[in-house]
């Protein structure tokens, strides 16, 4: 399953103490395939370095830069689908370019992009994505 994960969810799913940790585990085990553009990876790196101690952050960044875990996606067209926080457009553009099944985010700025009929991208909350993972992998 191809996904793009917004930074707010990624940062919160890494710790085993969060309810979203199953997302990180699904990523590490290859149950989901994470797609990220260079701009997305740079944002991940910036915020991981802010949130975690240097050694842990370095290990997380190494995983995020490993092509066995993350598929780097080039962006060929900028849709400008999110007007409230234009910085979030990189996630939308990555999802469109990669053909991702979902953008996983808890950010309300993505609501405007949900209403687009083209290009259609499934934008869901981390809670909804957990339910999808549960239904797919807890059979």
Regions found by a protein language model. Name each.
Residues 1-17:
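Metal-dependent nucleic-acid phosphoesterase active-site entry motif
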Residues 5, 21-49:
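PIN/NYN-family metal-dependent endoribonuclease catalytic core
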Residues 6-7, 36-37, 106-107, 125-126:
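A secondary-structure boundary/capping signal
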Residues 26, 64, 94, 115:
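Hydrophobic/aromatic ligand-binding patch that stacks against planar heteroaromatic rings
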Residues 33, 69-71, 122:
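Conserved beta-strand segments of alpha/beta enzyme cores
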Residues 69-103, 108, 112:
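Active-site neighborhoods of divalent-metal-dependent phosphate/nucleic-acid chemistry enzymes
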Residues 82, 108-139:
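Acidic, PIN/NYN-like endoribonuclease modules and their adjacent C-terminal/linker elements
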């Amino acid at each position: 399953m191809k996904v793009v994960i917004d930074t707010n969810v990624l940062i919160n799913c890494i710790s085993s103490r969060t309810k979203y940790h199953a997302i990180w585990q699904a990523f590490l085990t290859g149950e989901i395939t994470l797609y990220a553009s260079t701009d997305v990876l740079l944002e991940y790196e910036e915020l991981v370095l802010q949130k975690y101690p240097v050694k842990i952050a370095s290990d997380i960044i190494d995983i995020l830069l490993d092509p066995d875990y993350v598929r780097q996606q080039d962006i060929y067209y900028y849709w400008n689908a999110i007007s409230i926080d234009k910085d979030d457009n990189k996630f939308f553009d990555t999802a469109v370019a990669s053909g991702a099944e979902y953008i996983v985010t808890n950010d309300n700025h993505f609501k405007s992009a949900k209403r687009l009929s083209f290009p259609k991208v499934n934008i869901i909350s981390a809670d909804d994505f957990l339910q999808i993972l549960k239904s797919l992998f807890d059979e």
